[in-house]
Amino acid sequence: SNLRSTDVVGIQAALEQSGGDAFASYSITPEDAAGPYVASVPEDYGQKAQLERLSYTSVTEALAERFHMDENYLKALNPEANFNRPGTIIKVANFGRLVATPVARIIADKGKKQVRAYDASGKMIAAYPATIGSADTPSPTGTHAVSRVALDPNYTYNPNINFRQGENNKILTIPPGPNGPVGSVWIALDKPTYGIHGTPDPSKIGKTESHGCVRLTNWDARELAKIVSPGVTVEFLD
């Protein structure tokens, strides 16, 4: 785009079209400060299974995900802020509007590390950075379909089917929460144990392996969960 930095009206118009300013102000609420938060998320699945919920560990982790941001970036933007004090005004990313158009088909592109969603007319409506497949659960090939969508799912750890974590050789139910193995969303595919899901660690998307085949940030997985429905096709590209 060839807007001059002095063209204030033009810049405002372009920003409004794309969803407004890059940043917004946000006032921390008593609910934000209260949580509840967990002190830390254990690595071990046996210990995870004993918790009531795999919640966020801090106000900054919760707010970073709510505003589609890296947690360290949120802290760097607000070096003086006391995030635990209700009424504190912080600067957050203004991520624009959520996509609301229903999805007709999805492409999971391993080469580009990207999930793309298309509407019924074939227009691309969303593109999300993704981690696709792992050594434990290589991603499927060909075309599959969404079978169901679960928000805030618990996770069944079954060492006989998927992978083995530590010394855990029994089936475990891992409680729900944004810091669970599949984050806060599970979009099941018609191939058993495979799905599109969230992540406990958004900074590793596109870099680390996925336990359920296609991993997105929790915020992208939540957006996608609201616009997909059972029967939507998911095509895997190498």
Predicted feature residues:
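Extracellular LysM carbohydrate-binding repeats and other cell-envelope/extracellular binding modules
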Residues: S1-A33, K75-I106
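Active-site scaffold segments
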Residues: S184-I227, T233-E235
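Gly/Pro-biased beta-strand-loop elements
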Residues: A100-T199, P230
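Second-shell loop/turn segments in exported
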Residues: G46-A64, V103-A104, T173-G177, S184, ...
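Primarily a LysM-type cell-wall glycan-binding module
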Residues: S1, S27-H68
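LysM (lysin motif) carbohydrate-binding repeats in extracellular/periplasmic proteins that recognize
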Residues: S1-S5, S58-N84, K123-A126, W219-R222, ...
